[in-house]
Amino acid sequence: MLVIHQRLPARSPRWDEELHLTYEARSKSRLRCFAASGEEVGLFLERGLPPLADGDCLEARDGRVVRVFARAEELLHVTCASPLELTRAAYHLGNRHVALQVGEGWLRLLDDYVLKAMLEQLGASVNAIQAPFQPEHGAYGGGHHHSHHGEAEFNYAPRLHQFGVRR
């Protein structure tokens, strides 16, 4: 079994093995799967980090570099007649905590017949497609969480808009 414990800080121009994973699989820190070669793989990554992205590289215990590829999935591709309608669609999907990929004039989400009906009711054009899915990360660190009575406020640093900071 190819055992992987570490993400590499940068994408590597060369790799020894490939993992083709769905978004759900790329979201897991613990996973048993198979490499493109058919070799069994065990992922034991640090918890609490963003999902693996297409092109990310990992280092196996034996020193091999493994590149991650986003596998094509059944998605809904959403477009609208106006930016206002697209914003409204994004608002309603966000209100339901739906993982959402945002592009120039379009949204993509995992195929779901209930959400498809809702979007069509809002006037959106919704088409089923097969494509890799790379949704937005949350705007704040620490994952998804709601404060509850008696808990301290969460003070996550923003990840989207750090004005004056260049990366």
UniProtKB/Swiss-Prot annotation:
GO molecular function: nickel cation binding; unfolded protein binding
Keywords for this protein: Chaperone, Cytoplasm, Nickel, Nickel insertion
Locations listed in the record: Cytoplasm
Gene3D superfamilies linked to this entry: Urease metallochaperone UreE, N-terminal domain, UreE, C-terminal domain
Pfam families xref list: UreE_C, UreE_N
Organism superkingdom: Bacteria
GO BP terms: protein folding; protein-containing complex assembly; urea metabolic process
Assigned GO CC terms: cytoplasm
Similarity-based family: Belongs to the UreE family.
Function: Involved in urease metallocenter assembly. Binds nickel. Probably functions as a nickel donor during metallocenter assembly.
Cited NCBIfam families: PRK13261.1-1, PRK13261.1-5
Stated name of the protein: Urease accessory protein UreE
